[in-house]
Amino acid sequence: MKRTTSSLLLGSSLLATLPAFAGDWLQWHGESLTYLYGKDFKVNPDIQQTITFEHANKWKYGDTFLFIDKIFYNGKTDASKGVNTYYGEFSPRLSFGKILDRKLAFGPVKDVLLAMTYERGEGLNAAYLIGPGFDLDIPGFNYFYLNIYLRNTEGSRPGDNVWQFTPGWSYTIPLGRSDLLIDGYMDWVTDNDQTRRGTYHANLHFNPQVKYDLGKALNLGAKQLYVGFEYSYWKDKYGIDSRGNLQSNQSVASALVKVHF
């Protein structure tokens, strides 16, 4: 199953990156850098500074989202990662509506997609996710989607064949001379998995950002410079059961500055 999932993800991901080599297929793209500072993280050192690069695009047959975090532990040392680490996700999706050139809308669903994600952290920390995705038409939202994944990990660590539900959203509220943007996602893993290396527990990560468009307020251009905060609520972080000896329920608000370019 792992090899099949990995091959499917690799092949589809290569197809999903075709816009890099065929500019006429690329409909839009955007990049950003984000700085975060927060305290009271769990499992890892409690103070963290993070620099995040993000890329998003929409192309002829789907869309792609990529982010890479560089995380600094403010001089403290993580037992397995040292004083800093990295983590990233690559998430291409293929639109069946666009590939088949037909409208696949029903109810609140605007389109049906094949959703994939490759997660990669430091060390033997990688996972492949694949499943159906749905773009939803929710009044007032800039976008709203739901991806339903089957997770498989690389190597023998636990976390195989468990289901993950990932909604994502974006909503804009006019505020004075500018706007407040509320966007984010939630990862909800509904199953447990156990191997000789341990147990991966069901977990839920709710991760919205609340951002004020400072660039628009200062007449520097809309959707270029944001300030605000990111909130991370993670129950049973990393799939670690909080009922054990390690506190793994996390609730952290981080100061945020984000620049789009």
Language-model region placement:
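Outer-membrane beta-barrel transmembrane domain signature
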Residues: 153-224, 234-235, 259-261
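Short glycine/proline- and aromatic-enriched beta-strand/turn motifs that initiate or cap beta-hairpins
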Residues: 22-71
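Short loop/turn motifs that connect adjacent beta-strands in outer-membrane beta-barrel proteins
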Residues: 22-29, 61-63, 96-113, 137-145, ...
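Transmembrane beta-strands of outer-membrane beta-barrel pores
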Residues: 35-41, 70-74, 116-122, 148-154, ...
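Outer-membrane beta-barrel "beta-signal"
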Residues: 249-261
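N-terminal signal peptide c-region/cleavage motif recognized by signal peptidases
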Residues: 17-19
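Membrane-embedded beta-strands of outer-membrane beta-barrel proteins
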Residues: 53, 90, 130-132, 167-169, ...
